[in-house]
């Protein structure tokens, strides 16, 4: 049995009802949030999705160290992703907006440019989950990648879709981030990557 993200398996065995567990505290995961919106960056539209991400992830114990609204300019988005990963050393960057078919939707391109490794399963899981709700989910070009030791995840632009996509992946992300950061081993086998 694996109790991901809230407990670590120290050795194999069985857990029965009534057994006690030793809880080992872990540090909060640090996140950056980038909203990609031409209108939002000019103050012509209120950002609702960035604050929605913040509310959801803070309830899950994340610490938000940066939250910005930028234009859909690919270069600016890329630079902020790199800054958050390389200078702020956040565990995860969540972006919202700029993942559709519009000529100004540049978030996936900026994300792929920032990548040192691909992590497509996260974006695929969000699309799969969202397709159960709307066929328009197939129009998402969202990407999910790794930059060194930071995960970067593109989310849709609407608060409703942000909530749905985070529901699909958030429980598993913390485990993946801890493996990426070499703070945890594979789930269920009691190993640690740090020796």
Predicted regions and their residues:
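Non-catalytic beta/alpha edge segments that cap or flank active sites
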Residues: 4-195
């Amino acid at each position: 049995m694996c109790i991901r993200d809230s407990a670590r398996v120290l050795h194999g065995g069985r857990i029965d009802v009534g057994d006690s567990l030793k809880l080992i505290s872990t540090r909060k995961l640090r996140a950056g949030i980038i909203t990609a919106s031409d209108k939002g960056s000019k103050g012509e539209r209120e950002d609702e999705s960035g604050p929605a991400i913040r509310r959801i992830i803070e309830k899950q114990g994340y610490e938000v160290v940066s939250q910005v609204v930028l234009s859909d300019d690919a270069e600016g988005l890329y630079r902020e992703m790199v800054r958050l990963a390389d200078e702020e050393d956040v565990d995860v960057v969540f972006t919202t907006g700029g993942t559709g078919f519009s000529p100004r939707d540049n978030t996936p391109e900026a994300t792929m440019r920032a990548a040192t490794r691909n992590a497509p399963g996260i974006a695929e899981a969000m699309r799969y989950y969202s397709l159960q709700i709307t066929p328009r989910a197939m129009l998402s070009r969202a990407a999910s990648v790794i930059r060194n030791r930071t995960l970067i995840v593109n989310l849709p632009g609407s608060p409703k879709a942000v909530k749905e996509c985070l529901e699909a992946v958030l429980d598993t992300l913390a485990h993946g981030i801890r493996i990426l950061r070499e703070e945890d081993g594979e789930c269920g086998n009691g190993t640690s990557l740090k020796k």
